[in-house]
């Protein structure tokens, strides 16, 4: 999931005045949806459809709008604001191939600083700024000619999803009951994207450089820019400081510090009690037990039990003409090596589900998917025919396990070499997706993911959270504990 870079021309500044605002009781938020779609397209698509999963719309366009309204209602019940939140919504032909696609994106279309009710010299997303100010800060400002220049949030979703040239067969599921099967759950996807627009994003920091936006909202600058409202809550455990007190160079490094950036807001830290004990993989070798290894379960295949024997580990060797490890059907040598075992397969060149399915077809009983760069991975993908368990581990862990498998062989016989036996367990002293102090971690892979890095929860969280960089099939439409941590973070920044 991506949060798009906002238009710099949409950044706004309000000079604080000495006026006294009248206190008024907070009320439930109101969200209005403004369609950008022309007749016969997107929300206005007249294609007849059957009701699905509680969505009673009779046309494709109507069902799409019904999901928007359903998700907006969820946010309305969870937020308080005396100012209407406006969302510009449209369906567009976004980037696609037969095997991948941009699902959609959303973000705050305007950002504000120095308005009554906000922290001085701090950037806020528009919907939150309006709530804190108690007024619509764009009121009276002429539109920029687009028709949506003064909205709070702008969203766009891929109108071609599921067509042969656009992630073929994986269309949006428009039901409201979460039973998406192999389709993409549009309600969960939209709930996530509106979360970005409401403020789940560092928004005014360029993560590739660490630069902030200047007070005028006209450019990212190395020095002198204003911080995001997020920054005081972003604490780097390596640098031992928060982003508010970092240089641009330090923020750039922190954005690619795997498992190193924690969120310190009181609501989120309290809510992090919902996180489960850290799942670990134990590996017993002929000479002893390796240190516990963190893992993240794959999004496909059977659910991994908390405690279980996984099996004997194995490695594979490169095959002639392969595009990447495990990306083609296994040859005779690799099939013999992994039959009845758990191969360690490195990431790269094809989808995780493809690698696991090829291993399954060769007789594997499970798969460990090792990252090919530093940092954790939570293997995504979908294939209902995968019936063996799999999980993601770090590159360093994969290298250590491969070395252990090679070192174990001499401890057996030629007919039956020594093996490394893997099992699943948990570490009750640590929370999955949190640092040593129990503070939830942000997404900071070692290779920057523009639009995703920092502005999501980390992928090691368990249970899966709405604001991770991918939409997991087990998500509910809840934004608060005990299912989720989205609302606690939004409360930390002022909601």
Q: Residue ranges of each PLM-predicted region?
A:
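Extracellular zinc-dependent metalloprotease catalytic-domain scaffold
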Residues: 28-191, 196-294, 298, 302-309, ...
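Short secondary-structure boundary segments
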Residues: 371-372, 490
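Short hydrophobic alpha-helical runs that function as membrane-insertion/retention elements
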Residues: 343-345, 366-371, 392
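Short acidic, glycine/proline-enriched helix-loop-strand junctions
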Residues: 338-339, 372-406
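Protease-associated
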Residues: 269-357
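Non-catalytic positions within long, well-ordered alpha-helices that form the structural scaffold/packing
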Residues: 360-363
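Bacterial N-terminal signal peptides that target proteins for export
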Residues: 2-15
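N-terminal signal peptide c-region/cleavage motif recognized by signal peptidases
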Residues: 23-25
């Amino acid at each position: 999931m991506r949060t798009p870079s906002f238009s710099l021309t949409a950044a706004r500044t309000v000079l604080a005045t000495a006026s006294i605002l009248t206190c008024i009781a907070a009320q439930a938020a109101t969200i209005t949806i403004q369609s950008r779609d022309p007749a016969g397209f997107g929300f206005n698509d007249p294609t007849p459809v059957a009701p699905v999963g509680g969505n009673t719309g009779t046309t494709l366009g109507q069902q799409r709008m019904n999901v928007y309204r359903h998700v907006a209602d969820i946010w309305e019940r969870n937020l308080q604001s005396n100012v209407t939140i406006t969302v510009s919504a449209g369906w567009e032909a976004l980037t696609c191939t037969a095997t991948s696609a941009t699902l959609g994106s959303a973000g705050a279309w305007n950002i504000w600083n120095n308005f009554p009710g906000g922290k001085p010299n701090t950037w806020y997303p528009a919907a939150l700024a309006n709530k804190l100010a108690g007024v619509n800060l764009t009121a009276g400002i002429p539109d920029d000619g687009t028709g949506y220049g003064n909205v709070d949030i702008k969203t766009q979703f891929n109108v071609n999803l599921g067509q042969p040239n656009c992630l073929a067969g994986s269309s949006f599921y428009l039901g409201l009951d979460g039973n998406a099967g192999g389709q993409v759950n549009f309600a969960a996807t939209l709930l996530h994207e509106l979360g970005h627009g409401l403020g789940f994003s560092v928004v005014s920091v360029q993560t590739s450089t660490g630069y902030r936006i200047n007070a005028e909202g006209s450019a990212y600058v190395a020095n002198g820019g204003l911080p995001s409202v997020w920054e005081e809550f972003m604490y780097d455990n390596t640098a031992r400081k928060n982003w508010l007190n970092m240089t641009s160079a330090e923020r750039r490094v922190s954005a690619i510090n795997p498992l190193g950036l924690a969120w310190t807001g009181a609501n989120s830290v309290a809510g992090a009690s919902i996180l489960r004990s850290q799942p670990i993989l134990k590996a017993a070798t002929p000479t002893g037990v390796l240190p516990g290894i963190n893992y993240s379960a794959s999004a496909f295949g059977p659910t991994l039990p908390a405690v279980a024997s996984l099996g004997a580990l194995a490695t594979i060797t490169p095959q002639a003409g392969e595009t990447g490890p495990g990306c083609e059907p296994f040859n005779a040598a690799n099939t013999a090596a992994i039959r009845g075992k758990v191969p360690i397969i490195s990431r790269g060149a094809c989808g995780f589900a493809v690698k696991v399915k090829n291993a399954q077809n060769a007789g594997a009983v499970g798969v460990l998917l090792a990252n090919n760069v530093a940092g954790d991975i939570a293997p995504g993908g979908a294939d209902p025919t995968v019936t063996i368990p799999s999980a993601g581990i770090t590159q360093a862990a994969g290298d250590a396990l491969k070395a252990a498998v090679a070192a174990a062989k001499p401890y057996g016989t030629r007919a039956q070499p020594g093996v490394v036996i893997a099992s699943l367990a948990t570490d009750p002293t640590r929370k999955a997706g949190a640092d040593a102090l129990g503070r939830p971690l942000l997404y900071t892979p070692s290779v920057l993911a523009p639009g995703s890095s920092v502005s999501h929860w980390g992928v090691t969280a368990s249970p899966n959270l709405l604001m991770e960089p991918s939409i997991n099939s087990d998500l509910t439409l809840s934004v608060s504990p005990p299912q989720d941590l989205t609302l606690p973070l939004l409360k930390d920044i002022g909601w």
